[in-house]
Amino acid sequence: MAEEERTGRLGRLFAALVNVGDEDGGEASPEGAGPAGQDAEKDLAGGNTTVLDLEGLSRSLASSPDPMALLAGLVVDVRARVGATGAPELPGEAPKLPPSPLEVHLATRLVEAGLLEADVELPGVRVVRPRTSGLFYLRIEEERVSYLAKLRVLQVESALNSVLLASRALASPNDAPLDAIVRAEQRVTRSVAGQAREVAARLEGPVRGEWDVRYALAYGIEAFRLPHRLTARFRVNARAGVAAFELDLVPPEAWPRSAFVDGLGVVPATEQMRRRAAGTYNARLAALVAGYALAAAPELGEVWVAGVIDTARDHACLYSARISREALEAFDLGGSFDPVALLRSCGAAISPDETGGLAPVRQGFSLDDETLCPRERYDAPELSEATLAGELGDALGCWRVSDLGIDEGARRRHVADELARHLTGSTEKNVQAILAAAREDGHPDVIEAARRCVSGLIDGELEDDALAIGESFVEGGDLQRGCARARDALLSHDLEAAGKYATDALLPIDGLGSFDGSDGLVWRGFGSYADRALYNRLVAAPGERCALVPAAYLEAHTIAAASALARGRAEEALEHARRAAEVAPLSSQASLNLAQCLEATGDPEAAGRELCRLLSLAHDPESIGLGYLGMAQLQWQGGHVLTAQACYQRATRHLGAPALVARLAMAALIGQVGVSAGGELSPEQADSLLEAAGIPLAPTETVSAAFLEATRAATDAGIFRVARDLLRKLCMISRDDVYFGMLRSVEDEPDR
């Protein structure tokens, strides 16, 4: 009889090792099944145990300066109480209760994750619970960590999330025996693909267009509730109906080291069991992301998915598939299915090895494939002849793509890039090539640049070097050269020379009123595509025609203002600063310089109005922070100490490196105000003070709404130079994980 029982146990363990249908270490038995004695843990100390408060643990981890040490302390405490009877160890002491099976299981998973190992130093982490998933996220605080250290952090995170998800799958997790907890964990891993439609149903409104599809996919990656962190890179071409994912898979060595096997209970997981379980789970991830993408975005007809593993030594692709909507509809992702068979039915490259794990295969696509990343997305807006209609034009404030341009020299730059392919070491051939390029383009600006370069080559002032010729072609005008001399003088702290070079460069232009504008034409300069889009939406007059000034024009006025102010010539500085702010109304630097010059000329009220104008249009953290710092100084000098404190507090919310200075100033303010201020103001108090003083709360609702609409429109229109700049700043302000995911999905500009 004993021999039969031993043979039966070995048979069941062998089935757990090799049976593909019995996934994740064995199918869960019906509730209540399993070896006798599994429920005996509940009888320790008369059924009295401590309980695992996961929400309380989450709060403690989030506030802890060393979450790993806190978790290590939890493990030590649980181990010390295993076997406790519930009776006091010494007279007068409180009873020592044993841990619940859930506590024991969490401690076990943390030990399996290597939390207590000393072979690698774990990096500093911060624990957060993202709102989209509600899971634990261990954010590594150090820029560079070893592969093993990162793997350990991810394993600790997985231990926390596995227990969290298992506890949600149990009716009474703190009363559940160990086998029920482990079986619940395994049910969670087997059912991950079933959440695809449920998560897709949370999206608001129809998903249409490039922006909506990218938002939906980024949201899904953040919202999936998975026991192991999902790191995914993706690309989208909504017009072509295609999305592609590259998933970082779970390596077998990161898989739990114990599993439930039907008839055996919880047993140590062999290497083969872990390879098979990890391989099956990783294949399910492909079904999850493809199923979600197709459910969330009706415009998509096909989803490409590749699963990869990067270790300290190599990179491997474990599967590569192109999953069509029709192929996936044959499977019920919410039911029981074989994920490897699903991928094979879609024509995937996938190769299970003899252990049940996945062997490396060739990846069938790249995230940079032109199908996913059409090159025309990065065509220069300045040179575009495309038009914008309907909602796209309304959102971007213009009807021509070229009216989103910011680079006055874009045409010269384009011709110079093409010209570089035909330049040689021969002056004669270079002159011929330059003149031919100018004739082919025909634009007066290009013809003038060509004449300038040809003259320089013939006179010997310009070398027969492709880089030198290209630079002269684009930035070789009198204004640019004069501005460069002024910049060099300013960097050398020669203020007199800097001012002279700048004003000399500006004299021929401003003396003739070249950029004064008339008959609805205005001349403007912009530092970013985001600035231009907001200018179109919120500043430009109806029917206005906007031409671009060279960047050197704005820089020359800025240098002239700084030089004059440093030499005590406040009125002269004000004239230059006012012109710079007029030409670049979205430039925070021009606005700050103007406010400083107004204050220097004895007009703090005008300086305050200019800073209010800056804050009413500010849309990035640096502009907002510096605007509030400047306003705080004015308020402090005017005796409005509480309002100044409110400005400093708003500044610290947006600034990076200068925040320390702002905090020190705020501390000085709090000390000056004393008891009457009650210390630091609450956000509500600070906002009320600013509103009462007529100071905008940046970014304003108007700016935020226009910014989001413009970002969406530029993405849908496929104007990615504009879209990426807008999206980057949207991320900086919102700090929203979904927007960051969208930003990562935007490909880099292709080589041309």
For each of these PLM feature ranges, what is it?
Residues 489, 564, 598, 635, ...:
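Residue at a conserved register position within TPR or TPR-like alpha-solenoid repeats
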Residues 448-453, 463-465, 477-480, 484, ...:
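"A position-specific structural signal for the A-helix of alpha-solenoid helical repeats
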Residues 510, 551, 585, 619-622, ...:
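Short coil turns that delineate tetratricopeptide repeat
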Residues 443-446, 454-465, 472, 526-545, ...:
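Alpha-helical linker/edge segments of TPR/alpha-solenoid repeat scaffolds
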Residues 2-427, 449-454, 466, 470, ...:
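Long, charge-dense low-complexity segments
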Residues 495-496, 570, 604, 641, ...:
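TPR-repeat structural position
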